[in-house]
Amino acid sequence: MRLGVTVVELLVVISIIGILAALLLPAVQAAREMARQAQCQNNLRQVGLALHNYHSVLNTLPPGCMQWRPFNGPRFLKNFAWSALILPYMEEKNVHGLVNFDQPFDHPTNTLARKTNVATYICPTVPMVEGKSGKTDYGGLYGQRITTRINTDNGVFVYNQPFKFRDIRDGLTYTAAVAEDTGGPDGEWINGSNIFEQSGGINDPKAWVMDNEIRSHHRNGAMILFSCGRTWFVSNSCKLDTLAAMITRNGQEDWTIDP
């Protein structure tokens, strides 16, 4: 009776294991990405719930930026983002308590707040950058300049001006409010520049890297939160006129899309 294993048999077994691993690895990676994408979607749902809670209490949405400070503008302007204002309405009262709203967002008294991560604002698919904290992967939609170059403050979140739900005349269901904006230059949840105009398609490879645009690390699309609170994964192939229509709050456009 032969009790040993020949070298050939061992190599065959190793080869089979390698083939199985190669076949299973993509499936495992895909399953992990699906879980991360689901978490990203849940993050935006929490943001949507916070916006509705904010509106229920104050009868208005937050402004996109409170006391907007233009580039090289007066340093006394506070420049706080909508994403800082809604913190108490998404169970982040402790982080909200770190913010001194009597001083500008980048005042030394707000250093700790600026360095504090808020888990809901971080998409798990986006690689963490060592030394970067207080970031957000979601930006408010200031408007679109896909179909127009004038009056581009046609979105839900603009400088200094808060809107009520009734001001979103295209309907809450049909108006995007917040979208993934990974890797943008103004990606801090406290920074009032966390709003942007969309000028191209989703994950547009032609978009300048230093522009804030709808971008994600997901395959083939990005998560978008609509004003009603629902979230959609919108494909890179979304038509530009459709994307423009879903961003405007009062454009009176008709559009349909397969999510």
What is the predicted function of each stretch?
Residues 2-36, 46:
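N-terminal single-pass transmembrane signal-anchor helix
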Residues 19, 23, 34-259:
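Surface-exposed loop/linker segments characteristic of extracytoplasmic
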